[in-house]
């Protein structure tokens, strides 16, 4: 979805980019429209949380210091980490690091957030809080595409479900949607 692998068969389009014919020089433009949440965080360990976020903004063209500061404060508040900007990543718990990664992913108000196993390294309670945060972000306008092996999450946060197998993506939403209970009523009315 973010241009890392070539499309082998069929067609794929992401945010108006044909992934079969996208030129390498256009991949950075596509990626600026995406937010990526890595399972293993990928935070810069020698920089504070604030500096990690500032690095992304500057790399994507932000120049105004006050606007950068305001945006960082805004996303840290969104993920419940407004008091953690001065911390280094190794001073944070796994759940806190994942929240910072989500803050980084939403910095540029992406149309799509790709979340690769965002709960994979977290305890159950923290994992649910992370999925709830992603669910709230989705409700505010960004699409969230999340990979998971935790099938319980699919029941608690229903949505479209796809399975990747044999180099294909198959819609399996019906397998995970709650079944509607129906009651048949036979009205036998004699006139």
Show the residue positions of the predicted features.
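Helix-to-loop junction immediately C-terminal to a conserved catalytic motif
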Residues: 2
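Conserved ABC ATPase signature
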Residues: 88-92, 96-98
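Conserved ABC transporter NBD signature motif
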Residues: 10-18
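Short coil-to-helix segment of the ABC ATPase nucleotide-binding domain corresponding to the Q-loop/switch region
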Residues: 47-55
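Helix N-cap at the start of a conserved alpha-helix in ABC-type nucleotide-binding domains
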Residues: 124-126
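Catalytic Walker B motif of ABC-type/P-loop ATPase nucleotide-binding domains
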Residues: 113-116
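Conserved signature/switch motifs of ABC ATPase nucleotide-binding domains
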Residues: 87-90, 108, 140
């Amino acid at each position: 979805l973010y241009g890392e692998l070539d499309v082998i068969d069929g067609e794929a389009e992401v945010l108006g980019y044909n992934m079969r014919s996208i030129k390498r020089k256009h991949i950075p433009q596509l990626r600026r429209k995406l937010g990526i949440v890595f399972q293993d965080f990928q935070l810069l360990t020698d920089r504070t949380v604030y500096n990690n976020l500032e690095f992304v903004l500057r790399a994507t063209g932000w120049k105004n210091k006050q606007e950068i500061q305001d945006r960082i404060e805004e996303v840290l508040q969104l993920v419940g980490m407004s008091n953690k900007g001065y911390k280094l990543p190794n001073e944070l718990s796994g759940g806190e690091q994942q929240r910072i990664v989500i803050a980084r992913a939403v910095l540029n108000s992406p149309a799509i957030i790709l979340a690769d196993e965002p709960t994979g390294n977290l305890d159950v309670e923290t994992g649910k809080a992370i999925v709830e945060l992603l669910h709230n972000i989705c409700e505010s306008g960004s699409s969230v595409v999340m990979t998971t092996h935790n099938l319980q999450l699919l029941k608690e946060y229903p949505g479209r479900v796809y399975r990747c197998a044999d180099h294909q993506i198959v819609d399996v939403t019906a397998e995970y949607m709650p079944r509607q209970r129906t009651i048949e009523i036979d009205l036998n009315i004699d006139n």
